[in-house]
């Protein structure tokens, strides 16, 4: 699995639309759409919000975090 698929999995596991997920983590709908399509990656602030969301909803976060670190190292 790759980063875009993992973001989408986290969102879908919570039964949220892209708009709802964006509202919860404090970003624009278009931002979530770009993450899920692989056109961009979250910054550190967004990753912290996603982490908080995952912890609050008992969703594993570690895989997403590893993908994000790998992306930052490759960049």
Regions found by a protein language model. Give the residues of each.
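Short alpha-helical DNA-recognition segment
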Residues: 16-34
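A short, Lys/Arg-rich alpha-helix, primarily the initiator
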Residues: 1-13, 48-51
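Residue-level recognition of specific faces of alpha-helices
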Residues: 6, 31-34, 46
């Amino acid at each position: 699995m790759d980063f875009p698929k993992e973001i989408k999995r986290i969102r879908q596991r919570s039964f949220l639309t892209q708009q709802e997920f964006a509202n919860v983590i404090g970003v624009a709908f278009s931002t979530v759409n770009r993450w899920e399509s692989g056109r961009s990656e979250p910054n550190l602030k967004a990753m912290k919000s996603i982490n908080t969301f995952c912890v609050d909803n008992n969703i594993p976060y570690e895989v997403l975090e590893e993908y994000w670190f790998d992306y930052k190292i490759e960049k």
